[in-house]
Regions:
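Short pre-active-site segment immediately N-terminal to the catalytic Zn-binding motif
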Residues: 147-170, 200-206
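Catalytic zinc-binding patch centered on the HExxH motif and its immediate surroundings
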Residues: 116-148, 152
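Pan-zinc metallopeptidase signature
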Residues: 243-295
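Active-site recognition of the HExxH zinc-binding catalytic motif
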Residues: 35, 94, 141, 169-182, ...
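Catalytic Zn2+-binding segment of zinc metalloproteases
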Residues: 175-190, 224
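Long amphipathic alpha-helical segments used for membrane anchoring, targeting, substrate engagement
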Residues: 1-76
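Extracytoplasmic
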Residues: 82, 89, 105-108, 126-128, ...
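Short helix/loop segments within enzyme catalytic domains
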Residues: 81-105, 200-250
């Protein structure tokens, strides 16, 4: 992945190395990446349905002081510069898209942390994987997740330069949730899930996640047109990652069998299909997972 021409984002809070006191444990309306549950032996159904949790708790969790060592702006280290470049590219792509629709894109902040931190949706831990919190409109990322993605789950070839594009796909997926929030998709889904049983809520959540995968593909398409940043092997690497974090593959790895009714992010085939859909079309209209009967 070529990064040289990508705009750098300053909308980063660097909390790596910052120790925080644990506050409330509510996860709120966190939208999580699928690796969380089945890979670590945690039922992911406990980590979604955040709107219900928020209604019971009465609002966002009180955040602890992140400490005076939190810095803002583009970090100077290699990983920080990479995240800044990917985030900057998403800002440019989605700013253009919203402008074409006569709207204004309000970019999220990305929080880099190590181990644990506080979010507007509650206490965040490394085991949760990257996630987007609609309450504070921030993406939370413990970058050691990328090591797990590569070494433990074979999401891309460890040490290969193409792993960068896989990592960028993960970030673009979370930004996709922010786009969903701005478009009003997340609030509607959360409202609908309140009236559903767990199986129905899971099924709807899958459509949310697959749309975020498609939006990540839209970012890749439009970013390629702007900066020609995709190198040979990059797309295959991203597809390998999407497949590696499919619910069926994670369940089979963790428990030896698959329970489709418990899927919350989609199968490997579905995730790769929807990322590819966005990548080929470059249009948000192609990402309507809610009206598509065949996922």
């Amino acid at each position: 992945m070529r990064l040289d021409e990508l705009p750098k984002s300053a909308r980063i809070e660097d909390r790596r190395g910052v120790t925080v006191a644990r506050g409330g444990i509510g996860i709120g309306t966190v939208v999580v990446l699928g690796l969380i549950g089945w890979a670590l032996g945690i039922d992911p159904r406990l980590l979604i349905g955040g709107a219900e949790m928020m209604s019971r708790s009465g609002g966002p969790q009180q955040q602890a002081d992140a400490g005076s060592t939190t810095s803002t702006g583009s970090p100077s280290d290699t990983m920080g510069q990479f995240v800044s470049a990917v985030l900057g590219s998403t800002e440019a792509v989605w700013t253009d898209y919203f402008a074409q629709a006569g709207q204004t894109y309000k970019p999220p902040t990305l929080v880099m942390f190590s181990g644990a931190t506080q979010s507007g949706c509650g206490f965040a831990q490394k085991a949760m994987g990257p996630f987007y919190c609609p309450i504070d409109q921030k993406v939370y990322l413990d970058t050691s997740f990328f090591q797990d993605l590569e070494r433990r789950f074979g999401a891309c070839n460890v040490g290969s330069k193409t792993c960068q594009f896989s990592q960028a796909y993960v970030i673009a997926h979370e930004i996709g949730h922010h786009v969903q929030n701005l478009l009003g998709v997340l609030p509607k889904v959360q409202q609908a899930q309140r009236a559903m049983d767990q199986t129905e809520a899971n099924s709807l959540q899958v459509r949310v996640e697959l749309q975020a995968d498609c939006f990540a593909g839209v970012w890749a398409n439009r970013g390629q047109a702007k900066w020609d940043f995709i190198e040979p092997g990059d797309v295959d690497s991203a597809l390998q990652t999407a497949s590696a974090i499919g619910d069926d593959r994670l369940q089979r790895r963790s428990q030896g069998y698959v329970v489709p009714d418990s899927f919350t992010h989609g199968s490997s085939a579905q995730r790769t299909r929807w990322f590819t859909t966005g990548l080929k079309s470059g249009t948000v209209a192609s990402c309507d997972t809610f009206r598509n009967e065949q996922l």
